């Protein structure tokens, strides 16, 4: 601050700091040689500065007073060198450091490796002139990346190494995984084709046990002699399967529709005899009949239920017929 020690200058400083912005045009003080700009021109005036504590007008030792709050660092780049009361503009050269000159200082702080940073393109950033003298362009985009001086060089080096490792290693890993995946797919496809070619021709599914019982009850032909060649065996098994499907599929006819009467004449005759003897069967008797007729327990049970419903329907019709015969409707 290039201000004189006269009491008038000190009183000007105290008044300007305490009252903040002054209204009207700029003021010029002859004793101190300071020109103050009006606050309408600059929005950032002196209202943001801190107040001096314990300062009076007529004190001559006001230079030893320390402000309560520190100056704002960003104000240095806004001010001009023409004003004598402002803080001087820092030079573009490197400012002297507080540490001893024996410590070696790096010329530049770079986020990336030194190989990727050509020295020809190093430029100077104005906004970070006090913090970093030089900046280094990144490898991905041509713009400059300013690094503040409070970053340690060891931290930036470690981050740059980790960044390069993360960028290079996953490419090899992905390539190896993709090649292994493709090779495994091709091997699986080859094994599947081999299995399909080596599989023997499968025969049709065998008929269930109840179908065999029905064939035995209907008196089908006995099993033929074992054939000599495998081709004959295949033809015989296919013919037997077709016969068993046609004769033993007791719920569906050849055309695919549901059969009206899935039981054979022999089975129906045996069940009618038992029904005339007893309409309701016990479990033991039902098991005996199912063995004799080559049917399951459930089939015999369903047949007796249907037969009882049929008898009930017939008796109802006969009763209605008898009642209608007595009355003549003319």
Swiss-Prot record:
Belongs to the Abd-B homeobox family. This is Homeobox protein Hox-A10b. The lineage of its organism: Eukaryota, Metazoa, Chordata, Craniata, Vertebrata. GO terms for cellular component: nucleus. Transmembrane segments: none annotated. It comes from Danio rerio (Zebrafish). It comes from the Eukaryota. It is found in: Nucleus. Sequence-specific transcription factor which is part of a developmental regulatory system that provides cells with specific positional identities on the anterior-posterior axis. InterPro entries: HD, HD_metazoa, Homeobox_CS, Homeodomain-like_sf, HXA10/ABDB-like. PANTHER family: HOMEOBOX PROTEIN ABDOMINAL-B, HOMEOBOX PROTEIN HOX-A10. Residues 190-249 are annotated as: Disordered. Residues 256-315 bind DNA. Keywords: Developmental protein, DNA-binding, Homeobox, Nucleus, Transcription, Transcription regulation. GO terms for biological process: regulation of transcription by RNA polymerase II. GO terms for molecular function: DNA-binding transcription factor activity, RNA polymerase II-specific; RNA polymerase II cis-regulatory region sequence-specific DNA binding.
């Amino acid at each position: 601050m290039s201000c004189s020690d006269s009491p008038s200058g000190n009183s000007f400083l105290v008044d300007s700091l305490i009252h903040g912005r002054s209204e009207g045009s700029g003021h010029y003080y002859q004793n101190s040689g300071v020109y103050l700009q009006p606050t309408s021109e600059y929005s950032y005036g002196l209202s943001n500065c801190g107040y001096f504590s314990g300062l009076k007008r007529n004190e001559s030792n006001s230079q030893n007073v320390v402000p309560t709050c520190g100056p704002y660092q960003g104000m240095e780049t806004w001010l001009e060198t023409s004003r004598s009361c402002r803080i001087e503009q820092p030079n573009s050269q490197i400012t002297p450091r507080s540490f001893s000159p024996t410590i070696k200082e790096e010329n530049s702080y770079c986020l990336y490796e030194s190989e990727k940073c050509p020295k020809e393109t190093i430029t100077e950033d104005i906004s970070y002139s006090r913090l970093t003298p030089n900046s280094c362009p990144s490898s991905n985009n041509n713009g400059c990346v300013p690094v503040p001086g409070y970053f340690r060089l060891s931290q930036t080096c470690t981050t740059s190494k980790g960044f390069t490792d993360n960028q290079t290693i996953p490419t090899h890993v992905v390539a190896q995984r993709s090649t292994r995946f493709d090779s495994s797919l091709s091997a699986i496809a080859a094994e599947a084709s081999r299995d399909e070619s080596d599989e023997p021709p499968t025969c049709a599914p065998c008929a269930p046990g109840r179908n065999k019982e029905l064939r035995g009850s209907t008196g089908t032909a006995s099993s033929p002699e074992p054939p000599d060649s495998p081709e004959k065996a295949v033809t015989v098994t296919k013919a037997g399967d077709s016969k068993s499907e046609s004769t033993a599929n007791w719920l569906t006819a050849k055309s695919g529709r549901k059969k009206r009467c899935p039981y054979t004449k022999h089975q129906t005759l045996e069940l009618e005899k038992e029904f005339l003897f007893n309409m309701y069967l016990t479990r033991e008797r039902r098991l005996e009949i199912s063995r004799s007729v080559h049917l399951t327990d459930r089939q015999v049970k369903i047949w007796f239920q249907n037969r009882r419903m049929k008898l009930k329907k017939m008796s109802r019709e006969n009763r209605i017929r008898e009642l209608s015969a007595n009355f003549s409707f003319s």
